[in-house]
Design a protein with these regions (language model features):
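Hydrophobic transmembrane alpha-helices
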Residues: 77, 136-150
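Primarily membrane-embedded glycan-assembly and transfer machineries that use lipid-linked glycans
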Residues: 1-133, 154-295
Length: 295
């Protein structure tokens, strides 16, 4: 077994142990599983949206189906819930980076992994969604606006993939709505009242949602036209309704989309990408001159 695999496994186990041990008692600083605690409280309560304002501790903002999938975990203790939940972001990170880049990925996303948010799961859904479009339902039924990545299928006229993504989402909503219609009626209200609501919080990128969204749209369109899949997770990150610094973790999803499984491959991608970017910038004046001449 390569030594890098062992280091990756040890780091994953050590991180999991730290998250589980440090989550109890809840509220100490620096705490772990802060976001996961919101899911746990919503799971135990009768009203999942009793706390539903961005910036408020333990605010739950995702669709009812998210809690319905977590239903079996309501019967375990808080620490038991964390023990189960903490496996998911670590597994997602391992999927996106592979064993050789796991330590780098963990260093870049440790706060997000420890907090228990779903950005890395969003990243997995995006990567998997190129092959199995139904995976986009996870994006649409949690963070919602990163679903702007579906423009990839629109621009490329991959209508079958788009329909699979939308129909799968509709089917999930139909089943879930039958179980909790009241919660589904409230969820859109929760979303509209919280979009971009990160003003004044130190942990949020100070760029309003409506400023970020056009760049996300343009990036997906450009990426789709030039067959650059790595643009989709970056656009999804830009389109997050509330962009916390932890949301930058979605960028890790670019690793498998550019074929980077080792440090050497990642370095090569970065070097070649930089050269391409410089070349594009240098070509701008020439293109503008041609357009003026043609006009």
């Amino acid at each position: 077994v390569p030594i890098t695999y062992l280091f990756a496994l040890l780091a994953a186990v050590a991180t999991w142990v730290f998250i589980v041990l440090w989550c109890e008692p809840y509220g100490r600083w620096p705490g772990t599983a802060m976001d996961a605690h919101a899911y746990y409280l919503a799971l135990l309560g009768t009203d999942p949206y009793s706390i539903a304002h961005v910036g408020t501790p333990n605010a739950y903002l995702y669709s009812p189906i998210f809690l319905q999938l977590l239903w079996p975990l309501q019967f375990v203790s808080w620490q038991g819930f964390v023990a189960a939940w903490a496996i998911l972001p670590l597994a997602a990170l391992a999927y996106l980076t592979g064993p050789r880049l796991f330590l780098l990925g963990l260093a870049l996303t440790l706060a997000e992994v420890a907090g228990g948010n779903i950005e890395l799961l969003i990243g997995v859904a995006i990567v998997v969604g190129f092959r199995w479009p139904a995976a986009w339902s996870f994006v649409l039924l949690t963070k919602v606006t990163p679903g702007i990545g579906l423009l990839w299928f629109v621009v490329r006229r991959e209508w079958r993939s788009l329909m699979i993504a939308l129909l799968a989402t509709a089917a999930v909503v139909a089943v879930s709505f039958a179980l909790q219609p009241d919660a589904w009626i409230r969820w859109p209200q929760v979303l509209t009242s919280n979009t971009g609501a990160t003003k004044g919080t130190w942990a949020a990128v100070p760029i309003p949602f409506l400023y970020r969204l056009p760049f996300a749209v343009l990036l997906v369109i450009w990426g789709a036209r030039t067959s650059r899949r790595w643009t989709v997770p970056i656009a999804a990150m830009l389109a997050l309704p509330a962009l916390w610094y932890g949301g930058l973790a979605i960028i890790i999803a670019t690793f498998p989309l550019v074929g980077a499984k080792t440090w050497t491959e990642l370095r090569h991608v970065l070097v070649e990408g930089w050269k391409e970017l410089v070349g594009e910038v240098k070509a701008v004046p020439e293109r503008l001159a041609r357009r003026r001449t043609a006009a």
